[in-house]
C-alpha cells in the first residue's frame, strides 16, 4: 500500500535526523527492521531533509523545500486550511513527485512552558536553533502563549552565522555540558547567570 511505503520512506530519512519528529515516524513504522538504507542524507536547515533510498531521491520537509526542488503541491490555501493552531504539514516527495502529506500537531510541554514562563518573568528572551524544519517563531508563540519578541527562531542565514560561535573548541573560557531536559538546561543557564 502506498501509505505504508510513504511511512517507510519518511521514517528512513528521519531515523538519523530531526530529533523532534524522528520518533513520530519510527512509531508509525513500528518494525524498525523495515528502515531502508539512506545514502547521502542531507539536512536543509529550516526546510527538511534529502536522501537517496533505493536510488530514488527522497525529500521530507516543508513547502519551502518542495518548492526549491520543483515539486508540485496543493495550494497554499489548502495547506493553511489544514494547519491551524499548532498543526503543520510535512511533505514527502519521491523522484520529484509529491508522494504523501502528513499532518502533525505540536503540543506544549508543561516543563518547557514553566521554564519559558520563568525566563519571560525574569526579562529574558530565547533564541532557538532547531533541527525541526516546522519550528518557527509563530509556532512557539502559539504553543506556549508567548508575547511577540519573547522567542526568536534562527533563520538559515542566522544559523550559518552562529555555526563558528557554537562550534566545539578544545578549550574555552567557559562551557556547560548538557544531556538532560530543556528545563534542566535552562536551570543550568539560570544558575550560571546567578553566579556571574
Each PLM stretch: what is its role?
Residues 2-45, 67-69, 76-78:
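ATP-binding catalytic core of ATPases
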Residues 62-63, 70-72, 104:
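Surface loops and adjacent helix of pleckstrin homology
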Residues 53-55, 94-196:
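Conserved ATP-binding TGD loop and adjacent catalytic N/P-domain core of P-type ATPases
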Residues 15, 88-95:
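Short conserved beta-strand segments at catalytic cores or DNA/RNA-binding microdomains
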Residues 41-48, 64, 82-85:
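ATP-binding glycine-rich phosphate-binding loop
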Residues 84-91, 124-125:
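Helix-loop-beta junctions that constitute the ligand-sensing/allosteric loops
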Amino acid at each position: 500500500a502506498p501509505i505504508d511505503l510513504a511511512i517507510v520512506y519518511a521514517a528512513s530519512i528521519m531515523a538519523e535526523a530531526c530529533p523532534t519528529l524522528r520518533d513520530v515516524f519510527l512509531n508509525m513504522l513500528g518494525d524498525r527492521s523495515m528502515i531502508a538504507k539512506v545514502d547521502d542524507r542531507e539536512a536543509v536547515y529550516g526546510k527538511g531533509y534529502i536522501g537517496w533510498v533505493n536510488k530514488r531521491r527522497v525529500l521530507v520537509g516543508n513547502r519551502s523545500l518542495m518548492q526549491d526542488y520543483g515539486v508540485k503541491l496543493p495550494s497554499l490555501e489548502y495547506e493553511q486550511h489544514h494547519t491551524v493552531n499548532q498543526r503543520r504539514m510535512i511533505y514527502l516527495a519521491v523522484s520529484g513527485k509529491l508522494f504523501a502529506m502528513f499532518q502533525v500537531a505540536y503540543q506544549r510541554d508543561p516543563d518547557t512552558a514553566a521554564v519559558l514562563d520563568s525566563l519571560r518573568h525574569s526579562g529574558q528572551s530565547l533564541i532557538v536553533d532547531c533541527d525541526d524544519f516546522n519550528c518557527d517563531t509563530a509556532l512557539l508563540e502559539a504553543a506556549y502563549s508567548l508575547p511577540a519578541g519573547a522567542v526568536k527562531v534562527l533563520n538559515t542565514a542566522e544559523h550559518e552565522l552562529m555555526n563558528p560561535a557554537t562550534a566545539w573548541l578544545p578549550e574555552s573560557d567557559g562551557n556547560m555540558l548538557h544531556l538532560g531536559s530543556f528545563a534542566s538546561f535552562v536551570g543550568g543557564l539560570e544558575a550560571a547567570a546567578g553566579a556571574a
